[in-house]
Design a protein with these regions (language model features):
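Conserved C-terminal guanine-recognition region of P-loop GTPase G domains, centered on the G4
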Residues: 125-176
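Switch II of P-loop NTPase G domains
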Residues: 79-141, 161
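Canonical P-loop GTPase G-domain recognition
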Residues: 157-207
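A structural signal for isolated positions on well-ordered beta-strands in alpha/beta enzyme cores
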Residues: 33, 150-151, 180
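Conserved G1/Walker A P-loop phosphate-binding module
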Residues: 2-75, 79, 88-93, 97-99
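Alpha-helical scaffold elements adjacent to nucleotide-binding pockets in ATP/GTP-utilizing enzyme cores
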Residues: 48, 119, 138-141, 166, ...
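Conserved NTP-handling cores and scaffolds of large molecular machines
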Residues: 49, 53-56, 146, 201, ...
Length: 207
């Protein structure tokens, strides 16, 4: 994966004296947003892949969410929710750092999305097939702004319950949008989801 550096074209290379260590190279940073509905697994996704201790702004569920944030049976076991964002970082070969920002899932915090998406190359939209309607807002948001995104169907129990073509049809996404299974708890699965998004974003930038 090659992202452009900000080096000045034609500038002479600096000579490093013998025996002196090469100066550290500033990493190339890439911002990615992890989105989706309430209780879909965004915090878990970032936590499974981050090289650093994830920053999570979670708060206890309150009566304010009743009738507003429907997570079906998930509400029975979910006692906290992200109220601002989740943040994590993963370092890849070639001095490439991926900064991961998770959106708050509750509807009343959607006003923060514009700030979180600023500067991002794209988004991973997590999908819960038991509550497809919960990710409609995310899909509509990124499509309306022509921001590259992928749909990662989260297999909560490690079992794929719905066909990917059926999910694509239900969400009415364009054929070029990647739709695939993932497991937000599994580092390798989340890494593959991020690689798929970066590849899509690079292809879009290259025309």
């Amino acid at each position: 994966m090659a992202f452009p550096r900000s080096d000045v074209a034609g500038a002479p290379a600096q000579q490093v004296p013998v025996g002196q260590a090469e100066p550290p190279v500033a990493p190339i940073t890439v911002k990615i947003v992890v989105a989706g509905g309430f209780a879909v697994g965004k915090t878990t996704f970032i936590g499974s892949i981050s090289d650093i201790e994830p920053l999570s702004t979670e708060a206890a569920m309150t009566e304010h969410s009743v009738g507003v944030d429907d997570a079906g049976g998930v509400s029975d076991r979910k006692t906290s929710t992200t109220v601002a964002m989740d943040f994590g970082r993963i370092a890849l070969p070639g001095d490439l750092w991926l900064y991961l920002f998770g959106t708050p899932g509750q509807d009343r915090f959607h006003f923060m999305w514009d700030d979180l998406i600023t500067g991002a190359i794209g988004a991973v939209v997590l999908v819960d097939t038991e509550r497809l309607e919960s990710c409609f807002d995310a899909v509509d948001y990124f499509e309306a702004r022509q921001i590259p995104f992928v749909l990662a169907v989260n297999c909560f129990d490690g079992v794929a319950k719905h066909d990917l073509d059926a999910v694509r049809e239900a969400l009415a996404v364009r054929p070029e949008v990647p739709v695939f299974y993932t497991d937000a708890r599994n580092r390798q699965a989340t890494k593959q989801a991020l690689i798929t998004l970066v590849s899509l974003a690079m292809a879009r930038m290259q025309g």
